[in-house]
């Protein structure tokens, strides 16, 4: 092969191929093709010079140092120009026109395009355009032939591209140094410029951020202030592919105003309803409010930069004006800094939502939240009550305008902020606070209180462990709360008070001594129960007896704290009944066996029992918590005593 100009190859390409021993990259081919396309543009020579010098330096300074070949920048360059293509076609809609023309004028080429891009036959023009744009966004290698056929790079694109690359080259160093969190889950060994322009971009976040940076005009507003406000608006607005064109026009209009007047002056003097159309209205109001309190800018930005908050800190203003105890909390420097410090300490931005040490196996934050009115937190999701599982749900709760936010606000005001100001460790403070209430558990349950459910949540960390996804079924009845192990319909389910009783007998030494030789477990289905079970030999016959405890009255309702009942029975091993008659026969057989055995083991309580339809023995009375503990103790210890006496005979 002749490596000379007559073959279309120059020394630069020869050096690249010879030095690396590899074929030209996708970007090198694209660059060569673009050089030819811009040859008739008035800036053709400037393009080539800047591409090989200033722009190359910019890509080099922003390359991904974590990639396999950090000495190469071809990937960064390809993604960058493809991202510009995406912005160009989303804004102008030219690709739609090309597709429509291709469909009408060149049907065979249109079918070839459908086949190449894997487009369904019935797809409309917008769906086709979206498919191609998505291919570009992921830097899926598109042959130059199709870039040409689809007119993806018309002259107008190159006009947009040269201005864009020049803007990024000019602003990149300053932009990279800005103390602004841009919504990333993980920040690798890369620059801000790389993360919003030189890798796969998202329609809802990095593409609008890139457009905001490209749109910046020097004048009345600094780059930092411009990108801070844009960051806050973009990260807190749900942006779809359909929304992006109008938002780009909104940014175009607003940046012109900000080049003539300071952005904060504009926000202070504007009606939030009349500016920044298309962005989240709640966030616009927040930006207008923050612009009035620039003296607190440093702590506010610190909070905005937390991954959990991501620019949205409206709850800070709400907290500083709330009166949970009737006393006004003023917006002042000390309060803003204290609340900011606590919020960042509690919500550190990890995937779990809240700081792990506050939500470990002690679940201190959750238990503390349940101590303040309205004695619950979270939100309703899919017919379940959700106590926040993961970052998104905690965010939703913290930013809610529902009354349940008062639990968090009150916890900060009454407990955490005072501790923070005194430099007391927040975890230790929560532990001491929760334990002070928890140690009064039994006494508190004796009081008449329609919100007594909270004490079970406060006292037992195990309640939170059981709800692995922090879901429960909770209607308006505070005495009917069913804990779920997962989100699905087939989830295990345990009634709250029944499960709390299980935890007492499973882990509390005072309760464990009452069930010596008895196993304790749960039945998390249907009418859930805590069961006690013992195997033994009595009068030379082997038995397995059980006591099922549940929180239901005789009408199968739960109306008060005193709704405990139990079944006492021998575990039988009947086959499935083949008829109603056989079912009744099995029940009668079981009943006679139960009466016969328990009359000998615990005769003193037999008057407290009645027959159930299935042959088991059921408590006649409904018990209080103390009452059920007492009768359980009498039954288990009575049975133990009878077995011991029988063994001695």
Question: Which residues fall in each region the model found?
Answer:
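Flexible coil/loop and intrinsically disordered segments
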Residues: 1-649
């Amino acid at each position: 092969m002749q490596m000379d100009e007559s073959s279309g190859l120059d020394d630069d390409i020869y050096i690249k191929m010879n030095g690396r021993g590899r074929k030209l990259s996708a970007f090198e081919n694209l660059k060569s093709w673009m050089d030819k396309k811009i040859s008739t543009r008035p800036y053709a020579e400037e393009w080539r010079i800047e591409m090989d010098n200033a722009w190359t330096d910019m890509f080099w300074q922003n390359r991904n140092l974590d990639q396999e070949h950090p000495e190469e920048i071809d990937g960064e360059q390809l993604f960058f120009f493809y991202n510009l293509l995406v912005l160009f076609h989303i804004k102008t809609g030219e690709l739609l026109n090309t597709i429509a023309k291709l469909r009408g004028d060149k049907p065979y080429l249109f079918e070839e395009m459908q086949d190449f891009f894997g487009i369904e036959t019935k797809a409309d023009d917008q769906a086709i355009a979206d498919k191609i744009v998505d291919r570009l966004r992921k830097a899926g290698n598109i042959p130059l032939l199709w870039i040409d056929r689809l007119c993806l790079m018309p002259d107008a694109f190159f006009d947009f591209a040269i201005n864009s690359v020049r803007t990024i080259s000019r602003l990149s160093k300053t932009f990279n140094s800005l103390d602004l969190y841009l919504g990333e889950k993980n920040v690798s060994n890369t620059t801000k410029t790389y993360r919003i322009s030189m890798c796969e971009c998202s329609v809802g976040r990095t593409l609008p951020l890139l457009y905001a940076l490209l749109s910046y005009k020097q004048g009345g507003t600094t780059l930092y202030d411009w990108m801070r406000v844009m960051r806050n608006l973009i990260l807190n607005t749900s942006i779809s592919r359909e929304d992006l064109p109008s938002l780009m026009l909104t940014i175009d209009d607003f940046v012109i105003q900000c080049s003539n007047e300071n952005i904060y002056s504009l926000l202070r003097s504007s009606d939030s309803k009349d500016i920044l159309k298309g962005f989240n209205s709640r966030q616009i109001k927040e930006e207008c409010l923050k612009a009035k309190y620039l003296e607190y800018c440093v702590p506010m930005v610190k909070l905005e930069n937390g991954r959990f908050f991501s620019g949205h800190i409206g709850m800070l203003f709400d907290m500083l004006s709330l009166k949970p105890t009737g006393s006004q909390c003023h917006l002042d420097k000390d309060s803003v800094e204290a609340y900011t410090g606590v919020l960042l300490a509690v919500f550190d931005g990890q995937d779990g939502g809240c700081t792990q040490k506050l939500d470990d196996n002690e679940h201190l934050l959750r238990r503390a939240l349940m101590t303040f009115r309205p004695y619950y937190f979270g939100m309703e999701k899919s017919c379940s009550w959700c106590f926040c599982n993961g970052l998104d749900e905690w965010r939703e709760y913290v930013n809610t305008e529902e009354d349940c936010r008062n639990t968090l606000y009150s916890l900060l005001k009454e407990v955490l902020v005072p501790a923070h100001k005194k430099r007391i460790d927040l975890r230790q403070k929560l532990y001491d606070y929760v334990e002070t209430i928890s140690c009064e558990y039994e006494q508190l349950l004796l009081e008449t209180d329609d919100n007594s459910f909270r004490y079970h949540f406060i006292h037992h960390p195990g309640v939170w462990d059981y709800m692995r996804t922090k879901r429960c079924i909770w209607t308006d009845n505070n005495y009917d709360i069913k804990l779920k192990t997962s989100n699905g319909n087939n989830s295990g389910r345990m009634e709250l008070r029944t499960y709390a009783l299980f935890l007492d007998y499973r882990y509390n030494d005072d309760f464990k001594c009452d069930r010596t030789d008895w196993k304790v477990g749960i039945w998390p289905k249907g009418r859930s129960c805590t069961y006690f079970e013992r195997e033994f030999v009595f009068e030379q016959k082997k038995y397995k007896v059980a006591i099922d405890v549940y929180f239901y009255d005789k009408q199968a309702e739960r109306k008060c704290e005193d709704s405990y009942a139990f079944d006492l029975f021998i575990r039988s091993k009947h086959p499935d009944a083949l008829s109603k008659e056989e079912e009744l026969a099995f029940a009668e057989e079981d009943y006679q066996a139960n009466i016969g055995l328990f009359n000998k083991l615990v005769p003193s309580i037999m008057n407290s029992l009645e027959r159930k339809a299935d042959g088991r023995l059921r408590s006649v009375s409904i018990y209080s918590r103390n009452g059920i503990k007492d009768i359980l103790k009498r039954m288990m210890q009575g049975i133990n005593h009878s077995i011991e006496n029988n063994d001695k005979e």
